[in-house]
Amino acid sequence: MLKTKQQIIALNRFRCWTSNLPGLQQQCRNQSTVTAASSEWEQAKPLSEMPTISPFQLLRHFLPGGKYTNLDTTQLMLAFRRDFGPIVYFKGSLGKPDVVMTNNPHDFEKALHNQGIWPMRPGMEYLSYHRQVHRKDIFQGVEGLLGSQGEAWGSFRSAVNPVLMQPKNVHLYFNKMSEVNKEFMERIRKIRDPQTLEVPDNFEEEINRWTLESVSVVALDKQLGLITKNRDDPTPKRLFKALTDFFEASGDLEFQPSIWKYIKTPTFKKAIRSLDEITDITKMYVDEAFERIEAENKNRNVEKPENEKSVLEKLVKIDKQIAMVMAMDMLMAGVDTTSSTFTGLLLCLAKNPEKQKKLREEIMQLLPQKDSEFNEAVFKNMPYLRACIKESLRVYPLTVGNARTQANDVVISGYRVPKGTLISMNSVTLIKDDAHYPRASEFLPERWLRASKENEKSAECPHALKASSPFVYLPFGFGSRSCIGRRIAEMELELGIARLIRNFHVEFNYPTDNAFKSLLISVPNIPLKFKFTDVDN
């Protein structure tokens, strides 16, 4: 294992070294860029002139009775923009770094192109503490992706990238995920009210079970039976509760002044307890998966062909400890995130029946029967479904934006921002603004489609609906630190929504105001009493 890690680190360093050996022509271009940047820096205003507030004044606003008390993260970002304008500087205190918070997509682009070879996305230091200190017996120096930084992050990412970012590896799971989705459809039929056809208030738990079952197909290479067979197993409920507790605590620890490094606060203790529970349960699942893989390999006369090996088998071949931590990260990061995205899309389709009808027409051409199977050709030919997912992520964003520590000095909105400063890029304040998304209050999947001769003169021509900048909202991140589970999450959503819309007409006959609350990510905030009416075959 040590040899493997040393090889990964050496490879990373070699890549960094070779990336600094450009040709003479590139050197000239770089020199020109440096000169332009130097001139821009000289003409920019000093950071001291940027709108700001003292750490003490900011802390007062978070105390009981303060104007930022009890705001969720989305509400907080909107309040900051209202109070300080498009950009504000917060001096670091209580363990927090200096932060420049901007609401300008041009700043987003500059900050994301200034993130360096190992992009720093600070945050979740309590997760690093949990893995490095509190449970170092389990993690043994392998931190994973969620809370690590620098070379440790780069080494781990380099190890798992070839497996998780390879489309053909993800496509191994068409049939297994299809079985999970069929089981979910039958569960909906069983739990809905026979008269109203509405599902119970706690349908969110059913969505979470479906999501965890789907993620487990990849992370653990098996179905856990959470939808029907093993419903009475208390372990999944413990995991769901721990994940919820973790996200609730994380929202406070990430976005509000915290003194947990000095005093172990109740919120910090809650986060650590939930991480203990998540770690113990996911390790149990992962250990079972390892035992199963070893038993299967012993019973084989010949080694399984490489193109038939699962993601977990390929990760184990790299390093067993890396495989275990990556499986944990997939389970931790892949349940609530996908559940919230799935819920947001269902709400959008339920409240926009004409868009749901258009989507169903696309799906029925590819899946003529309710139980028709997916294949790669079908999977590639669903542009409107993908557009619906992208638009729902705009309407119901999963996070408030992105953040990166700057690798070099940079000019942001005309101000000098020194390297090492954290730039917070607040997309959530822009995505409902007509200046950035025309007709921003409407659910318009068409804005994500390619223009055609038929629609180029219509009001729904994609060119007329595009964002003001591709950097306004990047739900899966940007560059080398973009979401490593994107392909898995997209396939899970596409297969799940396609199967559901092929089987049911979806309605939601209740208000959707404040449908989500914003913690570390957005999570449902209302009972999800969807009405599911069967669609004819």
Swiss-Prot record:
Residues binding heme: 483
InterPro entries (alphabetical): CYP11_CYP27_families, Cyt_P450, Cyt_P450_CS, Cyt_P450_E_grp-I, Cyt_P450_sf
Domain of life: Eukaryota
Keywords for the protein's UniProt record, in alphabetical order: Heme, Iron, Metal-binding, Monooxygenase, Oxidoreductase
Record GO terms (molecular function): heme binding; iron ion binding; monooxygenase activity; oxidoreductase activity, acting on paired donors, with incorporation or reduction of molecular oxygen
Pfam family name, one: p450
Cofactor: heme
Known EC number: 1.14.-.-
Family: Belongs to the cytochrome P450 family.
Protein name (database record): Cytochrome P450 CYP12A2
